[in-house]
Curated annotation (Swiss-Prot):
Keywords: Ribonucleoprotein, Ribosomal protein, RNA-binding, rRNA-binding. Belongs to the universal ribosomal protein uL24 family. It comes from the Bacteria. Part of the 50S ribosomal subunit. One of two assembly initiator proteins, it binds directly to the 5'-end of the 23S rRNA, where it nucleates assembly of the 50S subunit. The lineage of its organism: Bacteria, Pseudomonadati, Spirochaetota, Spirochaetia, Spirochaetales. This is Large ribosomal subunit protein uL24.
Length: 101
């Protein structure tokens, strides 16, 4: 699935336990259609001890969210993204109000 989202974009989460939260995209997996949003969809991960002296621990880590469950969020407005060409330059814009990104 093709996406117009980029790393660093602010997005609003549309479904799941963090529904309504806003965060920035940390990474995008285009093959699996997943994004990782900073400080959203946190899960606990158990790290085993590598040596007998070291202790195992539990850390909080961001889990991937499906691309269909996030929407671009700019200046209080969440909208779908569109692409148009202006002066032979590709421009991303919000479909709701035509605002350039």
């Amino acid at each position: 699935m093709k996406t117009k989202l980029k790393i660093g974009d602010s997005v609003k989460i549309l479904s799941g336990k963090d529904r309504g939260r806003i965060g920035k995209i940390a990474s995008i997996n285009r093959k699996k259609n997943k994004v990782i949003v900073e400080s959203c969809n946190m899960v606990k991960k158990v790290i085993k001890a590598r040596t007998p002296q070291e202790k195992g621990r539990i850390i909080d880590k961001e889990a991937a969210i499906d691309i269909s469950n996030v929407m671009i969020f700019v200046k209080g407005t969440s909208s779908r993204l569109g692409i148009r060409f202006e002066n032979n330059e590709k421009i991303r814009y919000l479909k709701k109000n035509g605002q350039r990104i």
